[in-house]
């Protein structure tokens, strides 16, 4: 008798086990797989829209600058034209925001944080077109704003749009896809996938519900967004400052001093942003006409400023490599720094659709380079390179203002491809964050969200009082 031949009973047992395994697989909860697949869709769409937004803003800027170049020989025409073109473009952005989607004003990142806690609405059918077209207007006008805020808010709203289109009802999917879109948006803006992931984990840590599914979804969305960005824009770093030399160990104390300087500047900058917001609110009082005219005036002034001192206008990406290379004197760097602080306050605090990441990176570069050049003059024996302090300063102001040192470190290293500077970056950003916290500074985005929620509660209370008064009469 052949003992190797399986008996009929043994074959039956194998078939039953196989059928039971297949049945368990079919009955298994497919929610995690569905979330990961939709996260890939969110990341891909966010990457495509993010690239399209960048190209659209560049196209508008080129049209505006081209019109000015054609009239450059006629001073009587070029100055009024610079004001009018930028004013009209800015007014488009302000009008769309105020008329159709007030939550699309400003950076948009606090709105995503509020939505993650289900405290703010996500009206993607309004926010997506308003933020895209409005951002084209304000950024195309040459205002001192960045595109990362719009892409983060656009990404979060794409996450909610995909959720609605696929009719996914679970709270886990709603929260996860919103966070995935926001992370993919930051990655699409800066070609910085790891910074996009850290931004959600660190900056949105009070709101983000960390679990295996949510973090895998964020990873998936960021990967797809980064792939889309690199297909269209290549793999070069977004800011070309060249390969800088490493910082010698005996110079690291200088980076701690630089961090302490930014630890003082960060809370002061946040305070000025909030006070300027209050000033604008008192001026327009919520009236759309005043608000749009005010925005047009600010946009027009940025257009004029772009003719007088181009470095003081725009997001700042073109300024960063020039300043980091040491092409300006310390005095000129400080002058441009002060000018850009003022223009950043005017543009961002007025509620224009646009971010503040890029302007803060430029401000950090200016102050960091000025410090580096001064340190090189005071300590010639160290053979210091001002560019290394510029890189450290880029992340330090972001860390002190937003209170996200890890995001600031990784974002700058990914954007400049200077990973060898990670140690001075850590020292500078940690020093800036600790001193900012010691001085009582609050994270900028969290503070803006708290003010928005307080305003929302006040409006709801006033509405309730009016309805009660109407019933009594």
Curated annotation (Swiss-Prot):
Transmembrane region(s): 33-69, 77-100, 124-141, 148-166, 215-232, 253-281, 288-309, 330-349, 355-376, 422-438
The UniProt catalytic activity note for this protein reads: 2 chloride(in) + H(+)(out) = 2 chloride(out) + H(+)(in)
Top-level taxonomic group: Bacteria
The feature of type site (Mediates proton transfer from the outer aqueous phase to the interior of the protein) is located at: 148
Segments dipping into the membrane but not crossing it run: 109-116, 177-189, 193-201, 387-401, 402-404, 405-416, 417-421
Q: Which NCBIfam families match?
A: PRK05277.1 (NF003640)
State the protein's name: H(+)/Cl(-) exchange transporter ClcA
Motif (Selectivity filter part_3) spans which residues?
355-359
Pfam families, A to Z: Voltage_CLC (PF00654)
User: What does the sequence similarity comment in the record state about its family?
Assistant: Belongs to the chloride channel (TC 2.A.49) family. ClcA subfamily.
Q: Does the keyword Ion transport apply?
A: yes
List the ranges whose topology is Cytoplasmic. Answer: 1-32, 101-108, 117-123, 167-176, 202-214, 282-287, 350-354, 439-473
Name the residue ranges of motif: Selectivity filter part_2.
146-150
User: Motif Selectivity filter part_1 at which residues?
Assistant: 106-110
